[in-house]
Every structure is written in structure tokens, then in C-alpha cells.
Amino acid sequence: MAIIILVTPEDKVPWAMGLYQASMVMGLVFGPLMGGLAADLLGYRAPFIMFSALTGLCMLGIYLFMPNLQFEHKVDARESQLSLIKSFLVIPRVRLLVGLLFLCNFGITGIGPILPLYIKHYMHMNDEFVATIVGIIIFGAGLFSALASISIGKITERLTMPCIVFTATWAVGTLFILQYIMPSIWGLGIFRAIAGFFMGFITPIANTLISKAVPIERRGIVFGAVSSVAMMGNVLGPVLSGMIARAFGYGAVFWSTAAIFFVAALFIYRSLVIPSES
């Protein structure tokens, strides 16, 4: 991500972050799909060979086509990594946006483990079709998320980034509630896809705002830490969602996630939207 920020002109950063996020989401969507097809057609060892070859091609492409990039602005070699991380965590805007990235990944992955069980227990679906329906729902959410990420460049020309990220965060919270109250599987799937669309705005814009809030020479270490926090959201999302579902029921996962997004939206409004309008 730091390389993308380095080679992209400042006015094109939102577009670049959107394209990066779209490619990540589509990889997460199509990876299991292609792996499953390869396993069914060629055997369970085939996906390992196929993705090893793909990784090798990526490495070869980087070696052959990636230019030797050098940061013009370098940090003092005497500064430790910990001190560099602390230097950006003291910035309130950066803390808020990093927390938002964690929350977004938490919301995306947290619902995944309980979704098949929720559909099976509350929507009385045949066990034979639950896995297929969940796959379709996840694919739809990922596809709409990628479409939103790609369109960020044009949308930021009309609306401010704080306004977009506030609207998207509030909309995601509302859509989690709508997913819970839907009586049919198709209603759940539609609102899950719309929630994926709004989630597609959050990560690229948050990354863009972070890049604008820190000095150029510190963007590399900042985005390294940001990636770590985002991955923690991927890890803790399923764990905490499972604990909530066990203690309070499957519906509590939807309500708790929605509540967290609403709280995040209020912080965004106070810390980003109001200062940008004044």
C-alpha cells in the first residue's frame, strides 16, 4: 500500500485506493470459488499447485516489472519503529480512522461464521442449499463492495471524503439491522449486498485520509501498522461474533455490529465532518 501511495499523484490517491480495495475484495471472492472448482474438477491437491504457481508468477512479475523505487523523504535511522508508531497514534484523526478500518474488517468477517447457522435456524432452509445460498450472499456483497471501491474516484469529485465515510458508516449500521429483521433469505441477501456496497467506500477513503494526515516520510510505517490493525479485525471478528452468538443468540451479532457502526459514525461526524464544514 505504501508503494501505491508513493507512485500515485496526490489528486489520484482516492481512485488508487479504491482500485486497490476492489482488487483485494475480488480476490477474496473469487479465490474460494476458483479453489473449489479446481478441487472438484482436478482433486483436492490441485488448488495448492495452482495457487503456488500463481504466487510464483506474481513474484516473477514483481521482479521483472517493478521499478526500483526510492523514498525521497526518509525517516531518521535513529528513530525506533515503536516511536514512529506512537508518533502517528497521537493524531486523533489517524486513531479514529485506524479504528474504523478495524471495525470495517470486523463487520465483514464477523458475520461470516454465524450466517449459515442463522439462516438454518431462523429461515428454515434445507441443509442441502445453505452452503450454496451463503456463498451467493457473500459473492454478492463482495461484488457490490468492489463496484463501490472502483467508483470512489468520481464520487469524491462531488462529495467530500468525510461526508462519504460518515454516510457509508451510518448506512452500514442501519443495513445490519435491516438484515436481521428480514423474514426471507432473499431480503437478507439484498440488504447484505447493499451493506457490502457501502463498506466498499469506507476502507479506501479511510486509507486516503490517513495518508493525508501523516508526513510523507512516515507513510510507510503508518500503513504497515494500519495493515496489522486491519488484519486483527479479520481475526477478532469471527472470534468475538461467536462469543456474542453463544451468549446472547445469533441476532445479537447483527445488533451489536450495528451499534458499533453507529458509534463510529458519531465519532466521524464530530471529528471529521464538522471540522471540514467549518
Q: Where do the PLM segments sit?
A:
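C-terminal membrane-cytosol helix-exit motif in multi-pass small-molecule transporters
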Residues: 54-72, 267-272
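Juxtamembrane intracellular "pre-TM" segments in multi-pass secondary transporters
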Residues: 68-98
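Helix-to-loop junctions at the C-terminal end of transmembrane segments
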Residues: 148-160
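Intracellular juxtamembrane helix-capping segments at the cytosolic ends
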Residues: 1-8, 201-214
